[in-house]
């Protein structure tokens, strides 16, 4: 069960990275469509960061109250809602609005899963965890390119990422029992430890 859950955690970090590079990929076209200067991309990123900081600061309380599985599922759901919101946005204020739940969700996934892996798995898995974020960040523009190749627009690209996030949310909800099971790991000295 530990390796199944670890695989799911890796997939969560891939999904965390997927939308992170979309704004930069779409902004050269998007900023002209919504009639704002190029520099406004920074305001969207700033609001996303504010949400990330807030959720990171409250992650400990949320973790102890609801558990890692539930907080992760809700956080991924928030990013899915935000991606859908981005996909229907036609004004910059709408992007500002949806940047908040995006940041809250992304910060929740990041803080909770980093903590969970640090406590329940060997140190090498932390490196792989962040590698998975890189896979997601590199894959996001490819998904956008695929959507554009088939006649879609930037909004369809965000919609595609939203659908992937919704599917992951459903998988996370179904996997909640895995998060409650105690797993056995091997520590640095070779001893098996129940975590």
Mark where each language-model region is.
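Conserved MFS/SLC helix-loop-helix module at the cytosolic interface between two early adjacent transmembrane helices
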Residues: 53-93
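Short hydrophobic/alpha-helical segments at membrane-entry points of transmembrane helices
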Residues: 8-9, 91-99
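Helix-loop-helix hairpin linking two adjacent transmembrane segments in secondary transporters
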Residues: 92-94, 128-181
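MFS-fold secondary transporters
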Residues: 82-86, 102, 172
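Residue-level signature of mid-helix packing/kink "hotspots" within the transmembrane helices
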Residues: 21, 48-57, 138
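Extracytoplasmic
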Residues: 4-30, 34-36
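Cytoplasmic helix-loop-helix junction between adjacent transmembrane helices
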Residues: 98-132
